[in-house]
């Protein structure tokens, strides 16, 4: 039996990348998994909060972030090893970028990474994350660390069929549309994107930018304030869709000429994969973690946070029809991972 941890994801009202990973894996694991939560110092069945009886062949599987402070007694649970332990590791962004990360996340992360070393098996969401985690353990000097393999996350984010024909986007306004998805915060770097688009609009380049995402209440308001200021100046060329449903997001994909992903740091970069699933080329930051998927085609990597390079790249994707058609053809024809395949990888690794 796989006991699948939904302590946070089962009650969360927003749809972050971590929530997406948990929900899609849970769907694909189906009857092989039972949902559990950490409740009052013990792991319990999520449906009725009853106690669990483990056998040595059972697995506890979590894709969540945790600490002893958030889950009193969890460290003792790991030490007692009532069953086998497996985890999915995302990234060390709170340690690498503490100035733009929730203080609670920054405080939690060192202990979280250390607790991961007590598991029997860990999957990292990218090769970059795998090397990152192993490097942290090496620096920390932990002994008996578990094997870490790469789990390729799915591109089929909402279970929809993949677009496999290079159709042209249906932009109702007649102007090409760029789509930027992700939480509004400094790490996602919408500020640089807004300034780049502002300059292109001032140079009379006709296009729309659609920004979709919830606002990080700690870091997002200044970005939203700048966005609204530019909206007053440029009107309908800049549109903000906060908290859009999956259906609204699908509409935006259908109208998009390209997605733009100027992020400063990622564990995997699901927006890139999800864009390709929709057959939409992605202009993305030239991060090693994103290159793991971008190099397969359909993407235009651009130097991280380089205003001049992004301006050139956006102008090219908006005006060079032959280049855009090439990227679209690559996007719809290249192989892409699915959540069903990710679940199969886990089942094989767990021997279930």
Regions found by a protein language model. Give the residues of each.
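Carbohydrate transferase catalytic cores enriched for Leloir-type hexosyltransferases
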Residues: 1-352
